[in-house]
């Protein structure tokens, strides 16, 4: 099951040239850009691991592409995404986020039902990937 989070999530995977154009767009807007990765793809997992530090005041997309390549090399079977933050209003608001790397096999999610007091049923989804320990999920 293909994970659909962020901008461009329903499109085919972006090429490196397309990623560079998106990163260059963020740089031209003077947005801070960060690279994050995770092996827990749950939609509510908003705390991905940060690769290095966010890059502020970068003038050229090649520095960001270097960080992306380094992250891909170190974490080839992880989800990796690029985030761009706009602080012009005095807050760090994410204005662009897209996945740039995926594991070869995306196992998907299962629905878990739990009966609670009063015969109410609670539903939650869990990724099949989290059945394995962190760091060895893919």
UniProtKB/Swiss-Prot annotation:
GO molecular function: ribulose-bisphosphate carboxylase activity
GO biological process: reductive pentose-phosphate cycle
Name of the featured protein: Ribulose bisphosphate carboxylase small subunit
Compartment list: Plastid, Chloroplast
A GO cellular component entry from the record: chloroplast
Function: RuBisCO catalyzes two reactions: the carboxylation of D-ribulose 1,5-bisphosphate, the primary event in carbon dioxide fixation, as well as the oxidative fragmentation of the pentose substrate in the photorespiration process. Both reactions occur simultaneously and in competition at the same active site. Although the small subunit is not catalytic it is essential for maximal activity.
Cysteine disulfide partners in this protein: none
Quaternary structure and partners: Heterohexadecamer of 8 large and 8 small subunits.
The entry's keywords: Calvin cycle, Carbon dioxide fixation, Chloroplast, Photorespiration, Photosynthesis, Plastid
One Pfam family per UniProt: RuBisCO_small
Additional facts recorded: In this alga, in contrast to plants, the small subunit is encoded in the chloroplast. The basic functional RuBisCO is composed of a large chain homodimer in a 'head-to-tail' conformation. In form I RuBisCO this homodimer is arranged in a barrel-like tetramer with the small subunits forming a tetrameric 'cap' on each end of the 'barrel'.
Predominant location category: plastid
Family: Belongs to the RuBisCO small chain family.
